[in-house]
UniProtKB/Swiss-Prot annotation:
Residues in compartment: Cytoplasmic: 1-37, 100-109, 162-176, 264-295, 352-355, 405-427, 491-528
Its membrane topology: Multi-pass membrane protein
A biological process term (GO) from this entry: transmembrane transport
One function term, GO molecular function aspect: lysophospholipid:sodium symporter activity
Transmembrane region(s): 38-66, 74-99, 110-129, 139-161, 177-199, 242-263, 296-319, 329-351, 356-376, 382-404, 428-450, 468-490
Name of the encoding gene: MFSD2A
Biological function: Sodium-dependent lysophosphatidylcholine (LPC) symporter, which plays an essential role for blood-brain barrier formation and function. Specifically expressed in endothelium of the blood-brain barrier of micro-vessels and transports LPC into the brain. Transport of LPC is essential because it constitutes the major mechanism by which docosahexaenoic acid (DHA), an omega-3 fatty acid that is essential for normal brain growth and cognitive function, enters the brain. Transports LPC carrying long-chain fatty acids such LPC oleate and LPC palmitate with a minimum acyl chain length of 14 carbons.
Residues with attached carbohydrate: N218, N227
InterPro entries per record: MFS_2 (IPR039672), MFS_trans_sf (IPR036259)
Disulfide bond annotation, renumbered to this chain: C207-C460
Name of the protein described by the UniProt record: Sodium-dependent lysophosphatidylcholine symporter 1
Reaction(s) the record says it catalyses: a 1-acyl-sn-glycero-3-phosphocholine(in) + Na(+)(in) = a 1-acyl-sn-glycero-3-phosphocholine(out) + Na(+)(out); 1-(4Z,7Z,10Z,13Z,16Z,19Z-docosahexaenoyl)-sn-glycero-3-phosphocholine(in) + Na(+)(in) = 1-(4Z,7Z,10Z,13Z,16Z,19Z-docosahexaenoyl)-sn-glycero-3-phosphocholine(out) + Na(+)(out); 1-(9Z-octadecenoyl)-sn-glycero-3-phosphocholine(in) + Na(+)(in) = 1-(9Z-octadecenoyl)-sn-glycero-3-phosphocholine(out) + Na(+)(out); 1-hexadecanoyl-sn-glycero-3-phosphocholine(in) + Na(+)(in) = 1-hexadecanoyl-sn-glycero-3-phosphocholine(out) + Na(+)(out)
Extracellular side, ranges: 67-73, 130-138, 200-241, 320-328, 377-381, 451-467
Length: 528
């Protein structure tokens, strides 16, 4: 690879000396001001849909699927959810490490990860939604394939997230591409909710009026076995519906990966063209974790993201049992996601007009009154839909802002450590790591708390203790986490003035690097 860098300098030097025709010369100064086409931004944005589509389907439906369709004990379901999310979190820095060691290829450094992980991710995703016909080992089946899928989708999403820094050198173009990406990602959540919810919703999952029998006489045990056999048989349509939905989402996953790989090309930093020395991951990790702006940003978003993930993981059960909208919850979820999709452009305009920190406070805090309203008022379908639409506006801000602010932190890091390069994947992977790990802990604990409250698998109704627990999990706890996260954002140092200063300083640094490179190349051309 080092030889390739030398050849690049000779090529530039020859161009400077007039030895190459104008069509072959590389306009370095113009390149830094090139704009991304709308087509390139759309192709880049489409790549964000697979992660969100599968993640939304798993986030909203996996818990209720394990409890009421696979009929696992809540304790084992909590283990699967916790271990799967925790493993998902661990794989992010692991993949980030291997990406930092990956050499550049003709397809780039990041794109091969996306291409080769896709088919295996789709297969493992489908097997998560398949109920094996085995009397024992179901827990291990779901645990293994859930972890395999999380590993493979991480191999897709971490390089895709880091790709933000390599589609353009212009901060404004990256922000614009990020807005496109967030719009498509939220649209991906709409697709995930719509496909999974509408297909599964058409197959009515039967419930048990009085589960389970409290008497342990031989007669009651025999009757219980007969009833459970009958109900298991009646679940066939529901199980088939889950597999059909998984097949459709898997097809979309492949389509989006193809569009991304064909329509987007990685761009290397001009300074990186001069050296292909291997990057020290652990030295980079130490530098990243000591960067104050990064720690303050991910800490704030850690709590706010955790609030929305906790809401996501328990909302289906909350709508089904606490609100009593068993046949409407998929439409309520769809209303949230549609509202979020339609308001992404508004938040992009808002953060451009008023600044990103202001957008954080206004956007995320707007969810608080609606989270309180949905549990304080009596169950009312119209009010629930209004709350869902309003909550979607806040969800849009929570989607957009972290990914719009992380590149600002990376630019700040580059100015403080101009000699340290190739650590972009570390920033993104460890942000996702902390978010996923804490969400795994919270989701595992929330499912376990339902078990302690007396959750009845496939019951038509639940004990009052379960309803109280669900209210806490979708209202009180998320509100507390949001308020704590917003308090921590007060410490985040990069405001709009600081961001503009960093942008100008980074542009000056790049122009200085380009000028130095061109001077060296001219001297080399004169020697030639």
């Amino acid at each position: 690879m080092a030889g390739g860098g030398g050849a690049e300098r000779v090529r530039v030097g020859a161009a400077a000396a007039g030895l190459l025709p104008p069509s072959c010369r590389q306009p370095r100064r113009r390149e830094s001001r090139e704009r991304l086409s709308v087509c390139s931004k759309l192709c880049y944005a489409v790549g964000g849909a697979p992660y969100q589509t599968t993640g939304c389907a798993l986030g909203f439906f996996l818990q209720i699927y394990l409890l009421d369709v696979a009929q696992l004990d809540p304790f084992y379901a909590s283990i699967i959810l916790f271990v799967g999310r925790a493993w998902d979190a661990i794989t992010d820095p692991m993949v980030g490490f291997f990406i930092s060691k990956t050499p550049w290829t003709r397809f780039g450094r990041l794109m091969p990860w996306i291409i080769f992980s896709t088919p295996f991710a789709v297969i493992s995703y489908f097997l998560i939604w398949f109920v094996p016909d085995i009397s024992t080992g179901q827990v291990m089946w779901y645990l293994i394939f859930y972890c395999i899928f999380q590993t493979l989708v991480t191999c897709f999403h971490v390089p895709y997230s880091a790709l933000t820094m390599f589609i353009s050198r212009e901060q404004s173009e990256r922000d614009s591409a990020t807005a496109y990406r967030m719009t498509v990602e939220v649209l991906g959540t709409v697709l995930g909710t719509a496909i999974q919810g509408q297909i599964v919703g058409k197959a009515v999952t039967p419930c048990i009026e009085n589960p389970p029998f409290l008497s342990e006489t031989n007669f009651s045990v025999a009757i219980r076995n007969v009833n459970m056999t009958h109900y298991t048989g009646s679940l066939a349509d529901t199980r088939n519906a889950y597999m059909v939905a998984a097949g459709v989402i898997g097809g979309l996953y492949i389509l989006c990966a193809v569009i991304l790989s064909v329509g987007v090309r990685e761009k290397r930093e001009s300074s990186e063209l001069q050296s292909d020395e291997p990057v020290s991951f652990f030295r980079g990790l130490k530098l990243v974790m000591n960067h104050g702006a990064y720690i303050k940003l991910i800490t704030g978003f850690l709590f706010t993201s955790l609030a929305f993930m906790l809401l996501e993981g328990n909302f289906a059960l909350f709508c089904t049992y606490t609100l009593g909208f068993r046949n409407e919850f998929q439409n309520i979820l769809l209303a949230i996601m549609l509202s979020a999709t339609l308001t992404i452009p508004f938040w992009q305009w808002f953060l451009t007009r008023f600044g990103k920190k202001t957008a954080v406070y206004v956007g995320i805090s707007s969810a608080v009154p609606f989270l309180i309203t949905v549990v304080v008022l009596d169950s009312n379908l119209v009010v629930t839909y209004i709350v869902a639409v309003a909550a979607g506006i806040s969800v849009a801000a929570a989607f957009l802002l972290p990914w719009s602010m992380l590149p600002d932190v990376i630019d700040d890091f580059k100015l403080q450590h101009p000699e340290s390069r190739g650590h972009e994947a570390i920033f993104f992977s460890f942000y996702v790591f902390f978010t996923k790990f804490t969400s795994g802990v919270s989701l595992g604990i929330s499912t376990l708390s339902l078990d302690f409250a007396g959750y009845q698998t496939r019951g038509c109704s639940q004990p009052s203790e379960v309803n109280i627990t669900l209210k806490l999990l979708v209202s009180a706890v998320p509100v507390g986490l949001i308020l704590l996260g917003l308090l921590l954002f007060k410490l985040y140092p990069i405001d709009e003035e600081k961001r503009r200063e960093n942008k100008k300083a980074l542009q000056d640094l790049r122009e200085e690097s380009n000028s130095s490179s061109e001077s060296d190349s001219t001297e080399l051309a004169n020697i030639v």
